[in-house]
Amino acid sequence: MEFNVKSGSPEKQRSACIIVGVFEPRRLSPIAEQLDKISDGYISALLRRGELEGKVGQSLLLHHVPNVLSERVLLIGCGKERELDERQYKQIIQKTINTLNETGSMEAVCFLTELHVKGRNNYWKVRQAVETAKDCLYTFDQLKSNKTELRRPLRKMVFNVPTRRELPSGERAIAHGLAIASGIKACKDLANMPPNICNAAYLASQARQLADSSANVSTRVIGEEQMKELNMNAYLAVGQGSQNESLMSIIEYKGNQDPESRPIVLVGKGLTFDSGGISIKPADGMDEMKYDMCGAATVYGVMRVVAELQLPINVIGVLAGCENMPGGKAYRPGDILTTMSGQTVEVLNTDAEGRLVLCDTLTYVERFEPELVIDIATLTGACMVALGHHYSGLMSNHNPLAHELMNASEQAGDRAWRLPLGEEFYEQIESNFADLANTGGRLGGAITAGCFLARFASKYNWAHLDIAGTAWRSGKAKGATGRPVSLLSQFLLNRAGLNSDE
């Protein structure tokens, strides 16, 4: 689908459809008022008859509006003008895209980007419109024998900005939005793959393909033999019960040739299937444990964004691929593992495996002398209990980094919420037999998992994103969400000096 930006008046647009907003109760937006004036009150007369109230989610398609060059005018309900926020704005864009596809409009000019959204500029509105539109059009049908295709799919969308002076900002918003949308799609495609296809070797193949197709990107893969030499015993233990080899894929992007420039490292938990191991999970919903690699899928998607935008920074993405299965060789509750860092861990529950994979990976990345490290993981059900499906959990040992990530989450509309790492929580992961235990009980489970990881991240500035509640949806709309690709992409754009205020 093609996106463009322009500046012009609605009555002069020759298009299959132009899109304008209507507020509650039956109040025309400024652009809709222009069309109403040109059409001698045609639109306002329809509203007075009760054709459209203006509530969010409502729409009305008009054909051959008098004195308007476009074939059709689509009125979209925007709710109450003073209450229009970013969440409603995205809902409005979703409704617009779905309606256009239902009506068979192949191209359209959208004036909704001129609506006033609290605290948001035109760059944000255009970029969010692009990301939301691409998300609406996403399908995962690679494995279906009968693919359903729209008869007349939407092919082109033009966003209008108020003045020509804002065209460069709009064009930049489209470029950024398309790159991030592409990264989100890559993340979702990888996460939605079934575990009989997507194992650690598949993650490695995707990493290699990215290096082959992108400038400034290289990839290397660490297998089990090298992990043994590195004493990555916690990582190795998790995969012992599986016939699929554990593989750690390292994607390195070099956008800054300055030898003094230290890399930003992203570590993604890549449990391509998590049965729970010996501490096996309930059968109900276990199919969704293919999504336990959404951290790795996120890192892969973000590396795609970085490579596409050719950001002038150095970024290393690590996909910590593994599979947790029961079996005669599987690790057990009661085992004590010596991690790569030398710290020992008592295994109380084999279903608390993600932190065991991550702890050795966090030690491994010390060799890159990173500027900072962010790990992304579907780590705990406790985070879902705390924050639901709306916010990712954020923990950090460095306040400025936490503030940067929170700011990026606000900018991107990909929300996170910071949780504490207090000393009291560390007491919950003490062990009678080892340096620490791999679980700290039910209470504060998301935080004790973060505390566990923090014990392996003391040599650099570190943040942890628990995406267990935000990485995928269950139910009828089951599927990966692509979060938090947008948050991390915004963080890296800010780091590269390419934020929305540029």
UniProtKB/Swiss-Prot annotation:
Binding site for Mn(2+) 1: 274, 351, 353
Annotated GO MF terms: manganese ion binding; metalloaminopeptidase activity
GO biological-process terms attached to the record: proteolysis
Keywords, comma-separated and alphabetical: Aminopeptidase, Cytoplasm, Hydrolase, Manganese, Metal-binding, Protease
EC code(s) of this entry: 3.4.11.1, 3.4.11.10
Catalyzed reaction equations: Release of an N-terminal amino acid, Xaa-|-Yaa-, in which Xaa is preferably Leu, but may be other amino acids including Pro although not Arg or Lys, and Yaa may be Pro. Amino acid amides and methyl esters are also readily hydrolyzed, but rates on arylamides are exceedingly low; Release of an N-terminal amino acid, preferentially leucine, but not glutamic or aspartic acids
GO cellular component: cytoplasm
Cofactor list: Mn(2+)
Residues annotated to bind Mn(2+) 2: 269, 274, 292, 353
Cofactor binding mode and count: Binds 2 manganese ions per subunit.
Subcellular location: Cytoplasm
Similarity-based family: Belongs to the peptidase M17 family.
PANTHER family per the UniProt record, alphabetical: CYTOSOL AMINOPEPTIDASE, LEUCINE AMINOPEPTIDASE-RELATED
Protein's name in the database: Probable cytosol aminopeptidase
Species this protein is from: Proteus mirabilis (strain HI4320)
Gene name of the encoded protein: pepA
